[in-house]
């Protein structure tokens, strides 16, 4: 072997040492975040954006995501095409994330970016800011206090849900937080738990239809996307409405992103992500206000700003 082909051998570390390193680091981090300032349920674009903004301001944030991967639907645009769009002024968020983007050839005020670059850039930004990620972990319920104030979440390993019921006597655990953010997308899972108990006014869930999320011999739906809570697609109305309605839905619970549309019965916006990013920013500011954190305000974008050169 020539000198150019040689390399310094890996350190002499065995299997048990690898296992201990993983277990010790995970346990230490999890213990630190078992009682957090903010728990964000859902690691899609709005949840990650809120996590980034809060962590940058010194807020202790844990993101709970049921999938092995973070990012939700931000990896792809519509129809399995991996280009994502944002409408002005949300391209400013892509600038912040140092994500390349360009103006649409045919539409003024519409910008296109590479989905994997945008999504991975947002994940990295949230992690770099100090937000902690608990993936493969499924939200199952909320923790409540007096007057049903939200005080945390109940969660379990995601694979437990897929096991046959007769062998799944696996109790969940609970973690506490001063504030919970529902960023679970179309499902609005935390909001639904309160709605089921009759303690939350969620107009989008009051007359919830049935069958839209079912796929069997007699029905077809797109699970997680044809939510009965939100209205049909209307890009021009939906994005503004989602940002405007982002905020405190119940004492201790902030709603952001598509969970906002489901909660309030707003139209969906399809494969354009500006509202998801800006809604996450707004949710972070609401959280800062609720927690009375003395920090620099979150910069929610404005169309008065000068767009970046492409």
From Swiss-Prot:
Post-translational modifications reported in the UniProt record: During the catalytic reaction, a sulfide is transferred from Cys-169 to a reaction intermediate, generating a dehydroalanine residue.
Organism: Haloarcula marismortui (strain ATCC 43049 / DSM 3752 / JCM 8966 / VKM B-1809)
Residue segments, region Disordered: 202-226
Secreted in keyword set: no
GO biological-process terms attached to the record: thiamine biosynthetic process; thiamine diphosphate biosynthetic process; thiazole biosynthetic process
EC number(s) recorded for this UniProt protein: 2.4.2.60
Pfam families named among the record's database cross-references: Thi4
Binding site for NAD(+): 46, 65-66, 73, 171, 258
Record keyword Thylakoid present: no
Entry protein name: Thiamine thiazole synthase
One Gene Ontology molecular-function label: cysteine-dependent adenosine diphosphate thiazole synthase activity
NCBIfam families recorded: sulfide-dependent adenosine diphosphate thiazole synthase (TIGR00292)
Cofactor: Fe(2+)
Ranges of biased composition (kind: Acidic residues): 205-219
UniProt-annotated binding residues for Fe cation: 171, 186
SUPFAM superfamilies (UniProt xref): FAD/NAD(P)-binding domain (SSF51905)
Subunit relationships: Homooctamer; tetramer of dimers.
Role: Involved in biosynthesis of the thiamine precursor thiazole. Catalyzes the conversion of NAD and glycine to adenosine diphosphate 5-(2-hydroxyethyl)-4-methylthiazole-2-carboxylic acid (ADT), an adenylated thiazole intermediate. The reaction includes an iron-dependent sulfide transfer from a conserved cysteine residue of the protein to a thiazole intermediate. The enzyme can only undergo a single turnover, which suggests it is a suicide enzyme.
Family as reported in the entry's similarity comment: Belongs to the THI4 family.
Reaction equation(s) it catalyzes: [ADP-thiazole synthase]-L-cysteine + glycine + NAD(+) = [ADP-thiazole synthase]-dehydroalanine + ADP-5-ethyl-4-methylthiazole-2-carboxylate + nicotinamide + 3 H2O + 2 H(+)
């Amino acid at each position: 072997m020539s000198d150019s082909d040689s390399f310094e051998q890996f350190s002499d570390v065995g299997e048990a040492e690898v296992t201990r390193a993983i277990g010790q680091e995970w346990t230490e981090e999890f213990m630190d975040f078992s009682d957090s300032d903010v728990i964000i349920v859902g690691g899609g674009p709005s949840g990650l954006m809120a996590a980034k903004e809060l962590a940058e301001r010194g807020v202790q944030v844990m993101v709970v995501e049921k999938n092995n991967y973070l990012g939700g639907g931000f990896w792809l645009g519509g129809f399995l095409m991996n280009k994502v769009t944002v409408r002005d002024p949300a391209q400013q968020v892509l600038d912040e994330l140092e994500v390349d983007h360009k103006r649409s050839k045919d539409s003024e005020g519409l910008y296109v970016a590479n989905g994997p670059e945008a999504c991975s850039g947002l994940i990295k930004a949230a992690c770099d800011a100090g937000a902690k990620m608990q993936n493969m972990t499924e939200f199952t319920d909320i923790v409540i206090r007096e007057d049903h104030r939200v005080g945390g979440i109940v969660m379990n390993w995601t694979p437990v849900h897929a096991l046959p019921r007769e062998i799944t006597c696996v109790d969940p655990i609970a973690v506490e937080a001063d504030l919970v953010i529902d960023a679970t997308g179309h499902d609005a899972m935390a909001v639904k738990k309160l709605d089921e108990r009759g303690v939350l006014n969620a107009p989008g869930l009051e007359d919830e239809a049935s069958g839209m999320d079912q796929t069997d011999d007699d029905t077809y739906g797109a699970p997680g996307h044809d939510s009965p809570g939100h209205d049909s697609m209307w890009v021009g109305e939906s994005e503004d409405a989602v940002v405007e309605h982002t905020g405190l839905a119940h004492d201790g619970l902030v709603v952001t992103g598509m969970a906002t549309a489901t909660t309030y019965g707003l139209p969906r916006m399809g494969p354009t992500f500006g509202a998801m990013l800006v809604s996450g920013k707004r949710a972070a500011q609401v959280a800062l206000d609720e927690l009375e954190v003395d920090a620099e305000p979150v910069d929610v974008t404005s169309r008065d700003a000068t767009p970046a050169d492409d």
